[in-house]
Amino acid sequence: MDEKYVPFSHKGTKISSVPGKKRGEPASKRGLSDEQVCLLSGVERLGKSILNAFNLAKPTNQDILKMKNHIQNHSFIWTDGLSSYNELIEEKQCDHKIVKTKDDYDRVNHLNNVNSFHQKIEAQYKRYKGVASKYINRYAALFTMQRECRDMDSMETLIYIKRKLKKTKCYFYIRQITTLDIFTCIPERFT
């Protein structure tokens, strides 16, 4: 588990009390401040991942405890030593290894998976030219779905997305389905 910080963004809204800022311009305060949105992420070695934005600056114990539904009891967790993780680790009775420096890294104990995930998030942010902080959790869900679908073919991806959207309700008229090409990724043999 690790956290990633991205600058707070008012993209798409015009606020008279907030001065305009050009893309790539640094934050006015140094280090972690209330201008940085915290993305808390956890990545399994087998590929499953979770990413959520909880607050500005460092996450609190309560923020990290909101992720407890995604972590199994008695699992093994590698962190960077942030003390906010301790309550979650005790509650879930997890084994814990702190990996702070390069000397702590070896073939088993490392944060490479989560750091790779963070690099992919950075690449997506650059592609979208920044994301409004208002919608950051929606984009976080998109990033995790893209990560989980990266090695699937189109049919597996479609089934995965249908399972994720199973509890949502969405209504279409027959004429919309034929004109909007909603099911274009389904091969002809399945239609």
Predicted feature locations:
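Residue-level recognition of single "structural anchor" positions
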Residues: M1-T191
